[in-house]
Swiss-Prot record:
The keyword Isomerase does not apply. It is found in: Cytoplasm. This is Sulfur carrier protein TusA. It holds the Pfam family TusA. NCBIfam families: PRK00299.1. It comes from the Bacteria. The gene is tusA.
């Protein structure tokens, strides 16, 4: 089995079932709790996250390391700046 970036994160947030603006609010709360340089995997199914999570990362100067939005659940990996 191949290990992917989605399997190598420090923390995980399950936001499945939440709708805008809740997923990004949860990401913000969780990012605040982790150390700089650590990673957060977000699992969600809200289509608006395809726009909102990359925008959040740009605005807050965190690094979006990976995203998978072709199938559900959508997956994002953010590295805290």
């Amino acid at each position: 089995m191949t290990t992917t970036i989605f399997q190598q994160t420090n923390h995980t947030l399950d936001a499945i079932g939440l709708r805008c603006p809740e997923p990004v609010m949860m990401v913000r709360m969780n990012i605040r709790k982790i150390a700089s340089g650590e990673t957060l995997l977000i699992k969600c199914d809200d289509p608006s996250t395809a726009r909102d999570i990359p925008s959040f990362c740009r605005f807050m100067e965190h690094e979006l390391l990976a995203k998978q939005t072709d199938t559900l659940p959508f997956l994002y990996v953010i590295k805290k700046n």
